[in-house]
Amino acid sequence: MNEQEPAPKRGRRFKEQTPVQRALGLLVRREHSRKELNRKLLARGIEPDAAQAAVDRLTGEGWQDDARFAAAVVRNRAGSGYGPLHIRAELGTHGLDSEAISAAMATFQGDWTENARDLIHRRFGEQGPIDLPQRRKAADWLARRGFDGNSIRAATRFDLED
């Protein structure tokens, strides 16, 4: 057998992507906050000044928008069964200020108490928690998912007489 050298690969040669192209590649997949986008660019070895300039440019051109990102997070997390306290905390970790968080929370069209009830019905069946230990378990579970006390009481039918 003849040993042959492998043929040179044909095809496109990829040029090194600019910071703006890398950031745009991230934004095409899903929304990102400014802080998250900057952090991801830095993790990919882009210089801090270039990363910040890329984020500023994409924000100025409308590709990145913290309000749009926050509304998407609220919609996604509420649909996944998380309550308002959990969602607010998550938005805070993305570097959003309290005004942006409040505006995003106002975009939610549903009812937090109804969401909590739906979760309880899915977890405990149509009858819901029957006795006090089950109600406590349900209340603890909702609290861990970020629901407030009023929603928890309404969803678990928790009365002070119990």
Curated annotation (Swiss-Prot):
| Main localization, broad class | cytoplasm
Q: Per UniProt, which keywords does this protein have?
A: Cytoplasm
Q: List the disulfide bonds.
A: none
Cell location: Cytoplasm
Gene3D superfamilies (UniProt xref): Winged helix-like DNA-binding domain superfamily/Winged helix DNA-binding domain
Answer yes or no on keyword Cytoplasm. Answer: yes
Gene Ontology cellular-component terms for this entry are: cytoplasm
| Biological processes, Gene Ontology terms | regulation of DNA repair
Show the InterPro entries listed in the entry: RecX_HTH_1st, RecX_HTH_2nd, RecX_HTH_3rd, Regulatory_RecX, WH-like_DNA-bd_sf
Tell me the function of this protein: Modulates RecA activity.
Give the record's family classification: Belongs to the RecX family.
Recorded hits in NCBIfam families, A to Z, give: PRK00117.2-1
Protein name as it appears in the record: Regulatory protein RecX
